[in-house]
C-alpha cells in the first residue's frame, strides 16, 4: 500500500510540474499549488484505487458522521500546538497561524465515514517564513491511532516541501508519516 501511494504522489507531482510549473516558478500561493496538486492526485487515486472509491478533498472541514456536526479537524491539537510552540512566538500559535491552519491541505478519504481515512497531506513552499515543525506536528497527530476524541486516524501522512522560484524546480522533499511518527523521506 505504501509503495502504491508513493508512486501516486510521484506521478501527481510530475503532472503538476508538467502542467503548472508557472505556479512554482512565480511563487504563487500555497493554496493554488495545493489545489492543482489535488486535481492530479485525484486522477492518480482514481486510477490506482478504483475499487476503493476514495475522495480527494482540499481543506475539508466536515465530519457528517458526528452527531454534534463538529468540523473534521484536529481539535486535539490546540493545547499540544500551543504548548509546543509557546516559546517560539509572542502570541499563542493558533492565533499566530490562524485556526484554519489545523485543517489539512489535502485528504484522501471516504466522505461520510471515518472508517477509511487513507492519507493526509500538508504542502509547504520551500521559501515559507514558517518552519516545518508546525506541519510535522499536525501530521504526527493526524496519523496517531490512539486518539479517540476526533477520530482522525489517517493511515498515512505526507509532508511535501515544494521548491519554488526557479526555472526548473528541483525535486520536492517528501516526508511520510504513520502511527504518529515519521517513517520515511524521499526526494522525487
Regions found by a protein language model. Name each.
Residues 1-43:
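Charged, often low-complexity linker/regulatory segments
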Residues 51-114:
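Active-site metal-binding core of divalent-cation-utilizing nuclease and nuclease-like domains
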Residues 148-151, 155-188:
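Domain-level recognition of nuclease-like catalytic cores that cleave nucleotide substrates
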Residues 105-108, 117-126, 139:
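Conserved catalytic cores of phosphodiester-cleaving nucleases, focusing on short active-site segments
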Residues 21-26, 93-94, 123-127:
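Surface-exposed cleft-lining segments at the edges of enzyme active sites
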Residues 126-130, 165:
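Short acidic, S/G/P-rich loop/turn micro-motifs used as interaction or catalytic elements
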Residues 120, 131-162:
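Short, charged, amphipathic alpha-helix that recurs within catalytic cores of restriction-modification
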Residues 12-16, 115-121:
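Glycine-rich, often proline-containing surface loops adjacent to acidic residues and nearby aromatics
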